[in-house]
A protein has these predicted regions:
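Residues forming the flavin
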Residues: 1-51, 56-168, 172-251, 255-466
Length: 466
Protein backbone atom coordinates (compact mmCIF):
# COMPACT_ATOMS: atom_id res chain seq x y z
CA UNK A 1 0.00 0.00 0.00
CA UNK A 2 1.30 3.46 -0.98
CA UNK A 3 0.41 6.71 0.77
CA UNK A 4 -0.05 9.71 -1.52
CA UNK A 5 0.05 13.09 0.24
CA UNK A 6 -0.94 16.60 -0.84
CA UNK A 7 -3.27 15.56 -3.65
CA UNK A 8 -5.21 18.75 -4.41
CA UNK A 9 -8.46 19.25 -6.35
CA UNK A 10 -10.85 22.19 -6.63
CA UNK A 11 -13.91 22.14 -4.39
CA UNK A 12 -16.83 20.74 -6.37
CA UNK A 13 -14.99 17.83 -7.97
CA UNK A 14 -16.49 14.35 -8.23
CA UNK A 15 -15.17 11.09 -6.79
CA UNK A 16 -14.44 9.96 -10.36
CA UNK A 17 -12.22 13.02 -10.85
CA UNK A 18 -10.37 12.16 -7.66
CA UNK A 19 -9.81 8.63 -8.96
CA UNK A 20 -8.55 10.00 -12.29
CA UNK A 21 -6.10 12.26 -10.43
CA UNK A 22 -4.70 9.26 -8.56
CA UNK A 23 -4.12 7.52 -11.92
CA UNK A 24 -2.52 10.69 -13.30
CA UNK A 25 -0.16 10.91 -10.32
CA UNK A 26 0.77 7.25 -10.91
CA UNK A 27 1.65 7.93 -14.57
CA UNK A 28 -1.38 6.07 -15.88
CA UNK A 29 -1.25 3.08 -13.54
CA UNK A 30 -4.64 2.19 -12.05
CA UNK A 31 -4.74 1.30 -8.37
CA UNK A 32 -6.06 -2.11 -7.37
CA UNK A 33 -7.84 -0.41 -4.47
CA UNK A 34 -7.75 2.97 -2.75
CA UNK A 35 -9.23 4.88 0.17
CA UNK A 36 -9.21 8.41 1.55
CA UNK A 37 -7.08 8.78 4.69
CA UNK A 38 -7.48 12.52 5.22
CA UNK A 39 -9.40 15.39 3.63
CA UNK A 40 -9.10 19.08 4.46
CA UNK A 41 -9.97 22.47 2.97
CA UNK A 42 -7.23 24.73 1.59
CA UNK A 43 -8.54 28.31 1.54
CA UNK A 44 -5.21 30.14 1.30
CA UNK A 45 -6.08 31.43 -2.19
CA UNK A 46 -9.72 32.29 -1.44
CA UNK A 47 -12.13 32.60 -3.12
CA UNK A 48 -10.39 29.69 -4.93
CA UNK A 49 -10.94 26.72 -2.64
CA UNK A 50 -9.36 23.28 -2.78
CA UNK A 51 -9.71 19.95 -1.05
CA UNK A 52 -6.37 18.44 -0.08
CA UNK A 53 -6.26 14.65 0.22
CA UNK A 54 -4.06 11.97 1.66
CA UNK A 55 -4.78 8.69 -0.14
CA UNK A 56 -3.78 5.10 0.56
CA UNK A 57 -3.68 3.14 -2.72
CA UNK A 58 -2.64 -0.39 -3.62
CA UNK A 59 -0.74 -0.83 -6.90
CA UNK A 60 1.03 -3.66 -8.66
CA UNK A 61 4.83 -3.35 -8.52
CA UNK A 62 4.75 -0.72 -5.77
CA UNK A 63 8.50 -0.82 -5.21
CA UNK A 64 9.11 0.51 -8.72
CA UNK A 65 6.49 3.23 -8.29
CA UNK A 66 7.98 4.39 -5.00
CA UNK A 67 11.47 4.63 -6.47
CA UNK A 68 10.16 6.86 -9.27
CA UNK A 69 8.07 9.24 -7.16
CA UNK A 70 9.01 12.19 -4.99
CA UNK A 71 8.60 12.56 -1.22
CA UNK A 72 4.81 12.90 -1.50
CA UNK A 73 4.68 9.12 -2.01
CA UNK A 74 5.62 6.83 0.88
CA UNK A 75 4.94 3.32 2.06
CA UNK A 76 1.69 3.31 4.05
CA UNK A 77 1.94 1.94 7.58
CA UNK A 78 -1.35 1.57 9.45
CA UNK A 79 -1.25 0.67 13.14
CA UNK A 80 -4.31 -1.35 14.15
CA UNK A 81 -5.31 -1.23 17.79
CA UNK A 82 -5.62 -4.55 19.58
CA UNK A 83 -6.77 -4.95 23.18
CA UNK A 84 -3.90 -6.91 24.79
CA UNK A 85 -5.99 -9.39 26.75
CA UNK A 86 -8.67 -11.76 25.55
CA UNK A 87 -10.27 -14.33 27.82
CA UNK A 88 -11.80 -16.04 24.81
CA UNK A 89 -8.47 -16.98 23.23
CA UNK A 90 -6.45 -17.24 26.43
CA UNK A 91 -4.12 -14.30 25.71
CA UNK A 92 -3.26 -12.76 29.05
CA UNK A 93 -6.24 -14.05 31.05
CA UNK A 94 -7.61 -17.27 32.45
CA UNK A 95 -10.15 -19.03 30.28
CA UNK A 96 -12.18 -19.97 33.37
CA UNK A 97 -15.38 -18.12 34.30
CA UNK A 98 -14.72 -14.79 36.06
CA UNK A 99 -16.19 -14.76 39.57
CA UNK A 100 -18.69 -12.04 40.43
CA UNK A 101 -16.33 -10.23 42.79
CA UNK A 102 -13.56 -10.22 40.15
CA UNK A 103 -15.68 -8.93 37.25
CA UNK A 104 -14.56 -5.54 36.02
CA UNK A 105 -16.82 -2.73 37.26
CA UNK A 106 -16.95 0.56 35.37
CA UNK A 107 -18.33 3.67 37.04
CA UNK A 108 -19.64 6.14 34.46
CA UNK A 109 -20.71 5.65 30.84
CA UNK A 110 -19.17 8.59 29.07
CA UNK A 111 -16.64 7.96 26.28
CA UNK A 112 -14.03 6.39 28.58
CA UNK A 113 -16.50 4.11 30.35
CA UNK A 114 -18.31 3.23 27.13
CA UNK A 115 -15.17 2.06 25.34
CA UNK A 116 -13.72 0.37 28.42
CA UNK A 117 -16.91 -1.67 28.62
CA UNK A 118 -16.87 -2.40 24.88
CA UNK A 119 -13.31 -3.75 24.71
CA UNK A 120 -13.72 -5.74 27.93
CA UNK A 121 -16.99 -7.24 26.69
CA UNK A 122 -15.43 -8.24 23.37
CA UNK A 123 -12.53 -9.82 25.24
CA UNK A 124 -14.96 -11.98 27.21
CA UNK A 125 -14.78 -10.26 30.60
CA UNK A 126 -18.52 -9.43 30.94
CA UNK A 127 -18.07 -5.98 32.55
CA UNK A 128 -20.65 -4.29 34.77
CA UNK A 129 -21.36 -0.58 34.25
CA UNK A 130 -22.95 1.68 36.86
CA UNK A 131 -24.19 5.01 35.46
CA UNK A 132 -25.85 7.60 37.71
CA UNK A 133 -27.89 9.06 34.83
CA UNK A 134 -30.38 7.58 32.40
CA UNK A 135 -30.06 5.68 29.14
CA UNK A 136 -29.65 8.06 26.22
CA UNK A 137 -33.28 7.71 25.11
CA UNK A 138 -34.72 8.72 28.50
CA UNK A 139 -31.93 11.22 29.09
CA UNK A 140 -32.80 13.05 25.85
CA UNK A 141 -36.36 13.58 27.08
CA UNK A 142 -35.11 14.91 30.43
CA UNK A 143 -32.62 17.28 28.79
CA UNK A 144 -35.24 18.68 26.41
CA UNK A 145 -37.56 19.26 29.38
CA UNK A 146 -34.75 21.12 31.15
CA UNK A 147 -34.10 23.30 28.10
CA UNK A 148 -37.79 24.16 27.87
CA UNK A 149 -38.74 24.48 31.55
CA UNK A 150 -35.47 25.02 33.43
CA UNK A 151 -36.19 22.14 35.84
CA UNK A 152 -32.85 20.44 36.52
CA UNK A 153 -32.47 16.74 37.29
CA UNK A 154 -29.15 16.56 39.16
CA UNK A 155 -28.59 12.90 38.27
CA UNK A 156 -29.55 12.90 34.58
CA UNK A 157 -28.77 16.01 32.55
CA UNK A 158 -26.40 17.44 29.94
CA UNK A 159 -23.43 16.21 32.01
CA UNK A 160 -24.66 12.90 33.44
CA UNK A 161 -26.14 9.91 31.65
CA UNK A 162 -25.29 7.46 28.90
CA UNK A 163 -22.75 8.95 26.49
CA UNK A 164 -21.49 11.58 28.92
CA UNK A 165 -21.32 15.33 28.36
CA UNK A 166 -20.15 14.90 24.77
CA UNK A 167 -23.54 13.55 23.72
CA UNK A 168 -24.94 17.07 24.03
CA UNK A 169 -21.88 18.88 22.72
CA UNK A 170 -20.38 19.64 19.32
CA UNK A 171 -19.22 16.04 18.96
CA UNK A 172 -15.61 16.77 18.03
CA UNK A 173 -13.46 13.69 17.43
CA UNK A 174 -9.99 15.13 16.88
CA UNK A 175 -7.11 14.95 19.33
CA UNK A 176 -3.55 16.28 19.45
CA UNK A 177 -2.34 13.21 21.34
CA UNK A 178 0.06 11.01 19.37
CA UNK A 179 -1.57 7.72 18.39
CA UNK A 180 1.21 5.13 18.34
CA UNK A 181 -1.19 2.32 19.34
CA UNK A 182 -3.89 3.06 16.76
CA UNK A 183 -6.52 3.87 19.40
CA UNK A 184 -7.89 6.97 17.69
CA UNK A 185 -8.68 5.19 14.45
CA UNK A 186 -10.12 2.27 16.38
CA UNK A 187 -12.58 4.62 18.11
CA UNK A 188 -13.58 6.26 14.84
CA UNK A 189 -14.12 2.89 13.14
CA UNK A 190 -16.31 1.76 16.03
CA UNK A 191 -18.43 4.88 15.70
CA UNK A 192 -18.88 4.16 11.98
CA UNK A 193 -19.71 0.51 12.69
CA UNK A 194 -22.47 1.71 15.03
CA UNK A 195 -23.99 4.25 12.65
CA UNK A 196 -21.77 7.32 12.38
CA UNK A 197 -21.04 8.69 8.86
CA UNK A 198 -17.98 7.17 7.17
CA UNK A 199 -16.38 10.55 6.48
CA UNK A 200 -15.33 10.85 10.13
CA UNK A 201 -12.56 8.38 9.25
CA UNK A 202 -10.79 10.95 7.09
CA UNK A 203 -12.17 14.46 7.65
CA UNK A 204 -9.54 16.81 9.10
CA UNK A 205 -12.09 17.88 11.71
CA UNK A 206 -14.35 14.84 12.18
CA UNK A 207 -17.75 15.49 13.71
CA UNK A 208 -20.84 13.38 14.39
CA UNK A 209 -23.43 15.65 15.98
CA UNK A 210 -25.87 15.11 18.82
CA UNK A 211 -28.71 13.81 16.63
CA UNK A 212 -26.65 10.90 15.24
CA UNK A 213 -24.46 10.35 18.29
CA UNK A 214 -27.42 9.40 20.48
CA UNK A 215 -28.18 6.42 18.23
CA UNK A 216 -24.49 5.47 18.02
CA UNK A 217 -24.13 5.41 21.81
CA UNK A 218 -27.25 3.27 22.23
CA UNK A 219 -25.97 0.82 19.60
CA UNK A 220 -22.64 0.40 21.42
CA UNK A 221 -24.50 -0.28 24.68
CA UNK A 222 -26.59 -2.97 22.99
CA UNK A 223 -23.44 -4.72 21.75
CA UNK A 224 -21.96 -4.65 25.26
CA UNK A 225 -25.11 -6.27 26.64
CA UNK A 226 -25.22 -8.85 23.84
CA UNK A 227 -21.73 -9.98 24.86
CA UNK A 228 -22.67 -10.55 28.49
CA UNK A 229 -21.99 -7.10 29.89
CA UNK A 230 -24.44 -5.38 32.20
CA UNK A 231 -25.44 -1.71 32.25
CA UNK A 232 -27.28 -0.31 35.27
CA UNK A 233 -28.73 3.19 34.87
CA UNK A 234 -29.84 5.50 37.68
CA UNK A 235 -27.30 3.70 39.86
CA UNK A 236 -24.96 6.04 41.73
CA UNK A 237 -21.73 5.05 43.46
CA UNK A 238 -21.89 6.79 46.85
CA UNK A 239 -18.86 5.28 48.56
CA UNK A 240 -16.10 2.70 48.28
CA UNK A 241 -15.33 -0.09 50.72
CA UNK A 242 -11.75 -0.90 51.68
CA UNK A 243 -10.01 -3.20 54.11
CA UNK A 244 -6.53 -3.34 55.56
CA UNK A 245 -4.08 -5.53 53.72
CA UNK A 246 -2.56 -8.41 55.68
CA UNK A 247 1.08 -9.37 55.47
CA UNK A 248 1.12 -11.97 52.69
CA UNK A 249 3.66 -11.46 49.92
CA UNK A 250 1.02 -11.38 47.17
CA UNK A 251 -1.07 -8.80 48.99
CA UNK A 252 1.97 -6.61 49.70
CA UNK A 253 2.91 -6.74 46.01
CA UNK A 254 -0.62 -5.64 45.13
CA UNK A 255 -0.39 -2.81 47.64
CA UNK A 256 2.88 -1.68 46.09
CA UNK A 257 1.26 -1.65 42.64
CA UNK A 258 -1.59 0.50 43.96
CA UNK A 259 0.42 2.85 46.17
CA UNK A 260 -0.17 5.82 43.89
CA UNK A 261 -3.94 5.34 44.14
CA UNK A 262 -5.04 4.15 47.58
CA UNK A 263 -3.26 4.21 50.92
CA UNK A 264 -0.66 1.48 50.89
CA UNK A 265 -2.26 -0.54 53.69
CA UNK A 266 -5.73 -0.76 52.10
CA UNK A 267 -7.37 -2.57 49.23
CA UNK A 268 -10.73 -2.11 47.52
CA UNK A 269 -13.40 -4.64 48.48
CA UNK A 270 -16.62 -3.10 47.18
CA UNK A 271 -18.87 -0.15 46.42
CA UNK A 272 -21.90 1.43 48.06
CA UNK A 273 -24.57 1.88 45.39
CA UNK A 274 -27.73 3.96 45.51
CA UNK A 275 -30.73 3.25 43.29
CA UNK A 276 -34.19 4.73 43.78
CA UNK A 277 -33.15 6.06 47.18
CA UNK A 278 -32.01 2.67 48.50
CA UNK A 279 -28.33 1.98 49.28
CA UNK A 280 -26.67 -1.42 49.08
CA UNK A 281 -23.19 -2.92 49.16
CA UNK A 282 -21.73 -4.39 45.99
CA UNK A 283 -18.60 -6.55 46.48
CA UNK A 284 -15.89 -6.07 43.83
CA UNK A 285 -12.13 -5.75 43.50
CA UNK A 286 -11.58 -4.31 40.02
CA UNK A 287 -13.09 -0.88 39.36
CA UNK A 288 -12.55 1.71 36.63
CA UNK A 289 -13.72 5.18 37.65
CA UNK A 290 -14.60 6.88 34.35
CA UNK A 291 -16.50 9.75 35.95
CA UNK A 292 -15.50 12.65 33.73
CA UNK A 293 -15.39 16.31 34.70
CA UNK A 294 -18.49 17.12 36.70
CA UNK A 295 -19.08 14.32 39.25
CA UNK A 296 -17.85 16.56 42.03
CA UNK A 297 -19.56 14.63 44.82
CA UNK A 298 -17.66 11.52 43.72
CA UNK A 299 -14.36 13.42 43.68
CA UNK A 300 -14.97 14.54 47.27
CA UNK A 301 -15.86 11.01 48.35
CA UNK A 302 -12.71 9.55 46.79
CA UNK A 303 -10.61 12.29 48.39
CA UNK A 304 -12.07 11.45 51.81
CA UNK A 305 -11.15 7.82 51.17
CA UNK A 306 -7.52 8.92 50.66
CA UNK A 307 -7.28 8.41 46.93
CA UNK A 308 -4.19 10.25 45.75
CA UNK A 309 -5.11 13.46 43.87
CA UNK A 310 -3.36 16.49 42.44
CA UNK A 311 -4.89 19.83 41.37
CA UNK A 312 -4.83 20.61 37.66
CA UNK A 313 -5.05 23.75 35.58
CA UNK A 314 -8.18 24.25 33.49
CA UNK A 315 -9.84 27.01 31.47
CA UNK A 316 -12.75 29.32 32.17
CA UNK A 317 -14.52 31.96 30.09
CA UNK A 318 -17.56 32.80 27.99
CA UNK A 319 -19.27 31.65 24.79
CA UNK A 320 -19.33 34.08 21.85
CA UNK A 321 -21.88 33.79 19.01
CA UNK A 322 -21.57 35.08 15.43
CA UNK A 323 -23.70 34.64 12.30
CA UNK A 324 -22.40 31.45 10.67
CA UNK A 325 -22.37 32.99 7.18
CA UNK A 326 -19.99 35.76 8.31
CA UNK A 327 -17.46 33.20 9.53
CA UNK A 328 -17.75 31.31 6.23
CA UNK A 329 -17.17 34.52 4.27
CA UNK A 330 -14.18 35.36 6.44
CA UNK A 331 -12.61 31.92 6.02
CA UNK A 332 -13.64 31.07 2.44
CA UNK A 333 -14.23 34.44 0.79
CA UNK A 334 -17.38 35.91 -0.72
CA UNK A 335 -19.42 33.65 -2.98
CA UNK A 336 -18.15 30.48 -1.33
CA UNK A 337 -19.71 27.21 -2.61
CA UNK A 338 -22.41 25.80 -0.37
CA UNK A 339 -20.77 22.38 -0.17
CA UNK A 340 -17.83 23.55 1.96
CA UNK A 341 -18.16 22.73 5.66
CA UNK A 342 -19.45 25.32 8.09
CA UNK A 343 -16.34 27.32 8.93
CA UNK A 344 -14.48 27.55 12.22
CA UNK A 345 -11.54 29.59 13.46
CA UNK A 346 -8.88 29.76 16.17
CA UNK A 347 -7.72 32.86 18.02
CA UNK A 348 -5.01 33.32 20.64
CA UNK A 349 -3.61 36.29 22.55
CA UNK A 350 -0.97 36.76 25.24
CA UNK A 351 -1.69 39.52 27.78
CA UNK A 352 1.45 41.62 28.19
CA UNK A 353 0.71 42.67 31.75
CA UNK A 354 -0.04 39.27 33.26
CA UNK A 355 1.39 36.86 30.72
CA UNK A 356 -1.90 35.00 30.84
CA UNK A 357 -3.08 33.50 27.56
CA UNK A 358 -6.56 34.05 26.13
CA UNK A 359 -7.74 31.81 23.33
CA UNK A 360 -10.76 30.41 21.52
CA UNK A 361 -11.67 26.80 22.17
CA UNK A 362 -14.20 24.18 21.08
CA UNK A 363 -15.56 26.10 18.10
CA UNK A 364 -19.14 25.04 17.43
CA UNK A 365 -19.99 25.94 13.80
CA UNK A 366 -23.69 26.20 13.00
CA UNK A 367 -24.60 25.15 16.52
CA UNK A 368 -26.18 26.26 19.76
CA UNK A 369 -25.18 27.47 23.20
CA UNK A 370 -26.72 25.08 25.74
CA UNK A 371 -27.28 25.19 29.49
CA UNK A 372 -24.91 22.49 30.77
CA UNK A 373 -25.60 22.78 34.49
CA UNK A 374 -25.49 19.70 36.71
CA UNK A 375 -25.92 21.24 40.18
CA UNK A 376 -28.84 23.29 41.42
CA UNK A 377 -28.04 26.95 42.06
CA UNK A 378 -25.13 26.83 39.63
CA UNK A 379 -24.90 27.45 35.88
CA UNK A 380 -22.45 26.77 33.07
CA UNK A 381 -22.80 26.58 29.29
CA UNK A 382 -21.35 24.62 26.39
CA UNK A 383 -21.59 24.48 22.61
CA UNK A 384 -23.75 21.83 20.90
CA UNK A 385 -24.50 21.08 17.26
CA UNK A 386 -26.34 18.59 15.11
CA UNK A 387 -24.69 16.67 12.29
CA UNK A 388 -25.56 19.15 9.53
CA UNK A 389 -24.36 22.16 11.54
CA UNK A 390 -27.07 24.17 9.83
CA UNK A 391 -27.85 26.60 12.66
CA UNK A 392 -27.79 30.30 11.75
CA UNK A 393 -25.08 31.06 14.34
CA UNK A 394 -21.66 29.68 15.16
CA UNK A 395 -20.20 29.92 18.65
CA UNK A 396 -16.88 29.43 20.36
CA UNK A 397 -15.56 29.52 23.90
CA UNK A 398 -13.30 32.50 24.64
CA UNK A 399 -11.30 31.36 27.64
CA UNK A 400 -8.22 31.78 29.78
CA UNK A 401 -6.27 29.19 31.73
CA UNK A 402 -6.39 29.19 35.51
CA UNK A 403 -3.83 27.29 37.57
CA UNK A 404 -3.66 26.08 41.18
CA UNK A 405 -2.12 29.46 42.02
CA UNK A 406 -5.53 31.01 41.26
CA UNK A 407 -7.44 28.62 43.51
CA UNK A 408 -8.60 29.57 47.03
CA UNK A 409 -6.49 26.94 48.84
CA UNK A 410 -3.89 24.25 48.30
CA UNK A 411 -6.44 21.43 48.56
CA UNK A 412 -6.42 19.05 45.59
CA UNK A 413 -10.11 19.92 45.19
CA UNK A 414 -9.72 23.70 45.40
CA UNK A 415 -10.29 23.92 41.66
CA UNK A 416 -13.80 22.55 42.17
CA UNK A 417 -14.57 25.33 44.64
CA UNK A 418 -13.23 27.83 42.11
CA UNK A 419 -15.61 26.41 39.49
CA UNK A 420 -18.55 26.45 41.86
CA UNK A 421 -17.92 30.08 42.81
CA UNK A 422 -18.27 31.29 39.23
CA UNK A 423 -21.11 28.93 38.37
CA UNK A 424 -23.02 30.34 41.35
CA UNK A 425 -22.32 33.89 40.16
CA UNK A 426 -23.51 33.02 36.64
CA UNK A 427 -26.70 31.51 38.08
CA UNK A 428 -27.30 34.56 40.27
CA UNK A 429 -26.86 37.27 37.63
CA UNK A 430 -29.12 35.39 35.21
CA UNK A 431 -31.73 34.47 37.82
CA UNK A 432 -31.15 30.83 36.95
CA UNK A 433 -31.18 31.47 33.20
CA UNK A 434 -28.26 31.74 30.78
CA UNK A 435 -26.88 35.30 31.12
CA UNK A 436 -26.63 37.01 27.71
CA UNK A 437 -24.76 40.19 26.81
CA UNK A 438 -23.75 41.93 23.60
CA UNK A 439 -19.99 41.67 23.17
CA UNK A 440 -19.62 45.44 23.04
CA UNK A 441 -21.45 45.76 26.35
CA UNK A 442 -19.26 42.99 27.78
CA UNK A 443 -16.19 45.07 26.99
CA UNK A 444 -17.86 48.14 28.55
CA UNK A 445 -18.91 46.17 31.64
CA UNK A 446 -22.56 47.12 31.24
CA UNK A 447 -25.83 45.20 30.90
CA UNK A 448 -27.37 44.88 27.46
CA UNK A 449 -30.98 45.98 27.07
CA UNK A 450 -31.77 44.82 23.54
CA UNK A 451 -30.42 42.55 20.83
CA UNK A 452 -28.36 43.78 17.92
CA UNK A 453 -27.97 42.00 14.60
CA UNK A 454 -27.38 38.58 16.17
CA UNK A 455 -30.29 36.58 17.60
CA UNK A 456 -29.01 34.06 20.16
CA UNK A 457 -29.12 30.35 19.25
CA UNK A 458 -29.66 28.99 22.74
CA UNK A 459 -31.00 25.72 24.15
CA UNK A 460 -32.38 26.78 27.51
CA UNK A 461 -33.90 29.90 29.02
CA UNK A 462 -31.87 33.13 28.88
CA UNK A 463 -31.97 36.77 29.92
CA UNK A 464 -29.78 39.87 29.69
CA UNK A 465 -27.16 40.27 32.43
CA UNK A 466 -23.76 41.82 33.09
Amino acid sequence: MIRISQLKLKVGHTREQLFEEIIHQAHGKRPVSWQIVRKSVDARKKPQLFYVYTIDAEFENEKKLLSAKKSKWTRSTVVKYRFPYNKKDGSGASSTEVSTIDRAVIVGMGPAGLFAALVLARAGFAPIVFERGDCVEKRSEIVEHFFERGELDEESNVQFGEGGAGTFSDGKLNTLVKDKFGRNHFVLKEFVKHGAPEEILYEAKPHIGTDILKDVVASIRKEIESLGGEVHFRTKVCDILCEKISGSVAERERAEAEKNLLMQDKQLTGLILEKEGVQAEYPCRNVIFAIGHSARDTFYMLHERELSMNPKAFAIGVRVEHPAHLIKESQYGEGYPEEVPTASYKLTHQCKGTGRGIYSFCMCPGGYVVNSSSEKGRLCVNGMSYHDRAGHNSNTALITTVTPDDFPSDSPLAGLEFQRKYEELAYKIGNGKIPVQLFGDFLKNQMSTKLGKVTPSIKGEWQFAN
